[in-house]
């Protein structure tokens, strides 16, 4: 439960940080209310997605390594907890970040006296960025288990008493 709670808190923090640092998308709004994306719009989507995915990957590595340090809970149950919690935490962060990202919807500007440039809220463009965190968490935890070399994963409760 501690691991799940930590992953939820980290997901909320990830969403807050992402909403603050991810770049919004610039649009040109014409005086008659029509709008269009600027030529560099795809770059902004890529940067926003990369920031979210990389922050999730860092969280995934740190949480997997920290969970491995809990010797009494090593095993497939902790792997499922870390991966499932990472998926839930990343989803919470993604949804929260998308809601909190500041900006102006270009469709809401309407008719104005002159053309203008507005910045729409940041968006990752896809929900697939959520998968980076649990995927790397699973890879790191599995690597640590494979590298361990002990049949009992060095769990103190599984040592045989002779």
Task: Enumerate the predicted regions with their spans.
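Cytoplasmic membrane-interface segments at the C-terminal ends of transmembrane helices
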Residues: 1, 23, 61-82, 98-105, ...
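N-terminal export and membrane-targeting signals
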Residues: 1-8, 50, 73-86, 125-132
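Hydrophobic alpha-helical membrane-insertion segments
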Residues: 3-19, 80-98
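Membrane-helix exit/juxtamembrane interface segments
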Residues: 15-31, 99-103
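Perimembrane loop-to-helix junctions flanking transmembrane segments
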Residues: 26-45, 111-114
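Hydrophobic alpha-helical transmembrane segments
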Residues: 44-58, 116-139
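Alpha-helical transmembrane segments within multi-pass membrane transporters and channels
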Residues: 57-67, 85-88, 92
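Interfacial non-cytosolic loop connecting adjacent transmembrane helices
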Residues: 98-118
């Amino acid at each position: 439960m501690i691991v799940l709670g930590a992953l939820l808190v980290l997901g909320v923090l990830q969403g807050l940080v992402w909403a603050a640092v991810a770049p919004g998308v610039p649009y040109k709004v014409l005086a008659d209310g029509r709008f269009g994306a600027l030529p560099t719009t795809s770059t902004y989507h890529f940067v926003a997605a990369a920031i979210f995915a990389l922050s999730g990957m860092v969280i995934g590595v740190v949480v997997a390594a920290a969970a491995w340090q809990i010797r009494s809970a090593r095993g497939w149950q902790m792997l499922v907890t870390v991966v499932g919690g990472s998926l839930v935490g990343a989803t919470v962060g993604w949804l929260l970040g998308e809601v909190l990202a500041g900006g102006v919807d270009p469709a809401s500007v309407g008719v104005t006296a002159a053309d203008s440039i507005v910045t729409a809220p940041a968006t990752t463009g896809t929900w697939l960025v959520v998968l980076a965190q649990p995927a790397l968490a699973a890879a790191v935890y599995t690597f640590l288990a494979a590298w361990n070399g002990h049949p009992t994963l060095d769990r103190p409760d599984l040592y045989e008493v002779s």
